[in-house]
Amino acid sequence: MATPCIQNAFRRKTLPVRIGDLFVGSEHSIKIQSMTTTATTDVDGTVRQICALQEWGCDIVRVTVQGLREVHACEHIKDRLIQQNISIPLVADIHFFPQAAIHVVDCVDKVRINPGNYVDKRNMFTGKIYSDEQYAHSLEHLMNKFSPLVEKCKRLGKAMRIGVNHGSLSERVTQRYGNTIEGMVYSALEYAEVCVAMDYHDVIFSMKSSNPKVMVAAYRSLAYELDQREWSYPLHLGVTEAGSGTAGIVKSAVGIGTLLSEGLGDTIRCSLTGSPINEIPICIDLLKQTTELSERWGEADNPFAIHSSKQLGTRNTLNTPPWGNVYGLLINLTDVQLLTAEPIELLQCLGIDTTTGKIDPTTPEGVVVPKAMRSSPIVSEIEKHLLVFNKEDAPILNPMNEEEWLSEETLSAPFVYFEVTDIHTARRFFSLRQHSTQPVCLSFSLDPHLSKNEAIIDLSARLGALLLDGLGSCVLLDFVDIKLSRTLGFLILQSANIRSVTVEYVSCPGCGRTLFDLLAVSQRIRERTKHLPGGLKIAVMGCIVNGPGEMADADFGYVGSKPGMIDLYVKHKCVKSCIPIENAEEELVQLLKEHGVWKEPE
């Protein structure tokens, strides 16, 4: 048996950045951070939440600072933390108000700014065109406005995060580069150039998006551009506005897990709607599940190069009628499951209504069964609704045997199963077979000893990393819990922008700017709209500071505009404003009807 040359990743080397009493960077452990949801002016409540976050394992905490009232509150919060011997670094989140950053840096350990709104106006889609002269003048204006903060941070030894958000790029950047990954990267680099020119290097970067595919591509591109310039600054990873529940965990794990597996990332946050405390165990599990990969890190040329399907092999679907040319989901059924399960219960677990024969949108395309069970009554019943494959009809490739990957017997099969044990071996497999057009079914099994969240994170990180690069033709999941298998399978396919079979929800985690009960409203909107067809994306955002920008690719948006009032958006355009919150959900339904996407629940 041949020993494979596994495509290892090493952790990207970075400068150490000091934030309060801790250091961030490649020579230090990956840090977990979160953000308070209390009003920053509620000093008692904010301090209590910060203390709770630290107890749960949070390393860095951020608070929103909208103006001078919040600046003064931060002074009291920091004093209270010092009095209670709480050393967790305090970070101020700044949007639209540079003076708040200048003042608050005196009492916090780090400031976070958004290049899309710190100096320039956020893009309002006016169609304004910047000449080269106007663009150069804007860069000079940026230098003049941003340099006082850089100078003060440098003088006081305070850190800064330059946090770019997809969808909230400035008008100037959007006009030149579009709302693109390139625009995100150059937005960050413009601010980086000011820091470098002023010899200030306590800087961390983030490139967030609610779309994991955009987020991963943006971080890879920024890491490449920074290292081309020998600017080895740390990265903070996050999928912004990931949402709630299992879907939010999947999105975060697909994006963050992919980058961690490539050696990128020095701090992480899972932005889940609800209490920030709920984010911490997910982050802990995510780091735990990527530990095996980190133990494999060794030398490699450029592990975070911008991957593409052209580099690693093309994706060929099985194209089996009535499947068609889609990326399919298969569920493995063992002989034990087929022999012991109640037929009706098994069909229901697969998403088949045994009374009406109706198929759920998250029903897999097919099942894989042992050949000996093919003629059993239960398999015959399944075959009335789904495709059935004999497991023995295609080779199951050993991830540890490279010779088998390229053997004549393997390459002559109509398709193959490849068991994915780790991301780097799978990438090695596709790299060696990059000229092959043979469909590959990615096969995944889960350790039954994992908790539910650990299982979700493990599968999302392993499968998501490959799907984001367009690898494989279909997925075969082999879990005891069949219903969880199909739910996770489609959520991961949706997070990787491969397929969309259900409504996707974008919702922010909440912060001190949030104007309504975000979790409750999100859940109500989900319940009212979850029956709508796949491909639809609805955003629920707590305020207008980040809301309109961070829901960049949502079809419809529900955004808090002021206390008790909601604005409704179609794409990036506000179409109904200042709706009383008690009427807003019904108005959203009416808006969906006006645009022809509403249908009544059955």
Swiss-Prot record:
Binds 1 [4Fe-4S] cluster. It comes from Chlamydia trachomatis serovar L2b (strain UCH-1/proctitis). Pfam families: GcpE (PF04551). Pathway: Isoprenoid biosynthesis; isopentenyl diphosphate biosynthesis via DXP pathway; isopentenyl diphosphate from 1-deoxy-D-xylulose 5-phosphate: step 5/6. Gene3D superfamilies: Dihydropteroate synthase-like (3.20.20.20), Sulfite Reductase Hemoprotein, domain 1 (3.30.413.10). This is 4-hydroxy-3-methylbut-2-en-1-yl diphosphate synthase (flavodoxin). Converts 2C-methyl-D-erythritol 2,4-cyclodiphosphate (ME-2,4cPP) into 1-hydroxy-2-methyl-2-(E)-butenyl 4-diphosphate. GO terms for molecular function: 4 iron, 4 sulfur cluster binding; 4-hydroxy-3-methylbut-2-en-1-yl diphosphate synthase activity (ferredoxin); 4-hydroxy-3-methylbut-2-enyl-diphosphate synthase activity (flavodoxin); iron ion binding. Belongs to the IspG family. GO terms for biological process: isopentenyl diphosphate biosynthetic process, methylerythritol 4-phosphate pathway; terpenoid biosynthetic process. [4Fe-4S] cluster binds at residues 508, 511, 543, 550.
